């Protein structure tokens, strides 16, 4: 059972207060998907909403190098230029779900670490970047399915980071899971103080907590799960922040990752609604895992992944995709049956004709997350991703909650 820090217990009892105690967050960050630049060019970015924007992704290669292949290689220079013109820090991110295949190899020996450090520093200089983000999914834990992996990835990663930190004055951040990195036995490490010394901040990826790999529909990005039944406590912003702080990461170095997308599930009508109702959605309904729905036009289509394995459709809907597909109105409010879960502080919608239920985030849930960030003294938020929002509804909401002026 999760043991909460006393300060976090106090916070949970005051989450509904409208006047938070902390002065406010400092980092308003988002990822910019290089591969989506045709649909979401730089001219569509509302730069004034952000302090940092991070170009995703530079992928790791077999020989210890980096490549922007698949992420519009010609897009990074104009991205940095536009960010600088708008007074925004321009970062680049290394790795990601499909780009972490060779992270383990690149940091596996002292010689390879030194070479990888030089590669990254040279890359940052070439593109005039202001900051470096590392998105290794995941040290000492398999990600997409064909990543190189070593039981000593975590200590190797720290040694590499210490060398990188010594080689550059640029701030270093990392996107991390909802529990600290794995040790050699596959358990989360209990001391991250060494990492705290080299990271300017970490971004906790508090999304994909529930998805089509489970047996029931659940919240994609729960704010809290300590109020849920034990079987439904899969992780949340509350438990993740607690775990990282308990291991030695200061709250002021933690940025909360928030999503501009949701997971879609095929759910029968008889399972989607509470018994005897045609309007009230059921909690944690079962879904058809053999019939994953197609998401919006940005969703991964069924086919082979980078590992060569057959994959079904992703079932992912961006926030704008939910508007385009008739789940939400232009103002981001629901157009179909809807439920807001008071424990996870996240919404669900269901289209009875398509038999698709989506767990996602809306303005209300983002405002709750923003207040959590502000109340607990976190560094700020990071949106995955800037292109997924619709008319800045989500970023405005989390900014409001976190104490930024919109």
UniProtKB/Swiss-Prot annotation:
Signal peptide segment: 1-23
GO annotation terms (biological process): carbohydrate metabolic process; chitin catabolic process
Principal location: secreted
InterPro entries reported in the protein's UniProt record: Chitinase_II/V-like_cat, Chitinase_insertion_sf, Glyco_hydro18_cat, Glycoside_hydrolase_SF, Glycosyl_Hydrlase_18
GO molecular function, one term: endochitinase activity
SUPFAM superfamilies cross-referenced by the UniProt entry: (Trans)glycosidases, Chitinase insertion domain
Keyword presence, Flavoprotein: no
Function: Catalytically impaired chitinase that binds efficiently to chitin, but not to chitosan, xylan, or cellulose. Despite the lack of chitinolytic activity, retains substrate binding specificity and acts as an effector to prevent chitin-triggered immunity by sequestering immunogenic chitin fragments.
Further comment: In plants, chitin acts as a microbe-associated molecular pattern (MAMP) that is recognized by lysin motif (LysM)-containing plant cell surface-localized pattern recognition receptors (PRRs) that activate a plethora of downstream immune responses.
Protein name: chitinase-like effector
